[in-house]
Structure formats: C-alpha cells, structure tokens
Amino acid sequence: MSHAPANRPFDPAEYINSEIRTVPDWPQAGVQFRDITPLLQKPKSLRVLIDLFVQRYIDQKLDYVAGLDARGFIIGPILAYELNLGFIPIRKIGKLPFRTVSESYELEYGSATVEIHEDACKPGDRVVIVDDLIATGGTMMAGKKLLERLGATVIEGAAIVDLPDLGGSKLLRGAGLPLFTVTSFGGH
C-alpha cells in the first residue's frame, strides 16, 4: 500500500523563490540575472509578495515607504497603498522636477547618483526603503543617507531578493541598517 506524502504547509518565501526566473549570462557573461517579472505577472504571486511585506510592516508605525529607482517603484507604491502611507521616490539624478538633495555612490565600474525632493519627508518620519534586490548595496545605502539627511529614521531596508555573495547585505547591516528579504540566491 502506498502512502502519499503529507501536504506541506504553504511557505510564502519558497513560493516567491520558485516564481523568480534566472537568466544566465545577462546582461553580460557570467551573470545570473534574477528576473522578478514572472512573479509580477501572476496575481497570486504578486499578492503573496505584497502580503509578506504588509505583515512585516503593518505594526511598525511608519510614515512612508521609499522606493529605489526603478524596480523599487513597482513594489513600493503598492506597499504604501496597502499600509495607507505616502510613497517617496528615490530617483536617478535629473528625474525629479523640484529642488533635490543628492547622494553619489560607487558602482563596479564608475559611479551613480540618486536624489529625492528636499521636502520628501521631515525630521522624525519613519521610513522603510524597498527595492527588488540587494546586490552591492550601493543604491540602498545612498537612499538611506538621503533620507537621514532630511531627518528621517530609516527603520529597515526591504527587498525581494538578496544576493549575499555580492556583499551588499553585509555592507548595509554593517552600516546599521536592518534588512528584510524574502529570498536569496548565491552567485552573481
């Protein structure tokens, strides 16, 4: 007599992980690109993802969700809406129409700059920063510095994916930024 294995309980993080596509050698040879678009295309996986973030932050007494350009603009506004909070876009330089403050950071080959409006938040506001993934941590670190320069308290950085082999999560935690990620992948 054969026995079917007992059904395992639903694991949201495992499910999210299974919905992320790996594209080898993109955008260059040796890179394993973690593509979140399949996750976003399915209502169930998008709902599971947003629900994970909502559960994490519903009782945190936040004032804003800040999203990093560009894929943080996908999850960030949805999360802000679900939590009844405002959304702060942290943009690449030259994309915001009002007066801004900016922060430059190093990339693997060169540097980049992000900025926010100078009135994006006020001293004492509690903010979570969201993005699709944490690689080197440079963009999230720059966003943290910008928000803190305006007097906000960044309570946590959040991402769907952590790529710990690239050192970003270690860098951010070392700088005092707690992190929440749904899943992680080794390699580059």
Swiss-Prot record:
<dbReference type="GO" id="GO:0003999">
    <property type="term" value="F:adenine phosphoribosyltransferase activity"/>
</dbReference>
<keyword id="KW-0660">Purine salvage</keyword>
<comment type="subunit">
    <text>Homodimer.</text>
</comment>
<dbReference type="GO" id="GO:0044209">
    <property type="term" value="P:AMP salvage"/>
</dbReference>
<dbReference type="InterPro" id="IPR005764">
    <property type="entry name" value="Ade_phspho_trans"/>
</dbReference>
<keyword id="KW-0808">Transferase</keyword>
<dbReference type="Pfam" id="PF00156">
    <property type="entry name" value="Pribosyltran"/>
</dbReference>
<comment type="pathway">
    <text>Purine metabolism; AMP biosynthesis via salvage pathway; AMP from adenine: step 1/1.</text>
</comment>
<dbReference type="InterPro" id="IPR000836">
    <property type="entry name" value="PRibTrfase_dom"/>
</dbReference>
<comment type="function">
    <text>Catalyzes a salvage reaction resulting in the formation of AMP, that is energically less costly than de novo synthesis.</text>
</comment>
<dbReference type="InterPro" id="IPR050054">
    <property type="entry name" value="UPRTase/APRTase"/>
</dbReference>
<dbReference type="GO" id="GO:0002055">
    <property type="term" value="F:adenine binding"/>
</dbReference>
<dbReference type="GO" id="GO:0005737">
    <property type="term" value="C:cytoplasm"/>
</dbReference>
<dbReference type="GO" id="GO:0016208">
    <property type="term" value="F:AMP binding"/>
</dbReference>
<dbReference type="GO" id="GO:0006166">
    <property type="term" value="P:purine ribonucleoside salvage"/>
</dbReference>
<comment type="similarity">
    <text>Belongs to the purine/pyrimidine phosphoribosyltransferase family.</text>
</comment>
<dbReference type="GO" id="GO:0006168">
    <property type="term" value="P:adenine salvage"/>
</dbReference>
<keyword id="KW-0963">Cytoplasm</keyword>
<protein>
    <recommendedName>
        <fullName>Adenine phosphoribosyltransferase</fullName>
        <ecNumber>2.4.2.7</ecNumber>
    </recommendedName>
</protein>
<dbReference type="InterPro" id="IPR029057">
    <property type="entry name" value="PRTase-like"/>
</dbReference>
<keyword id="KW-0328">Glycosyltransferase</keyword>
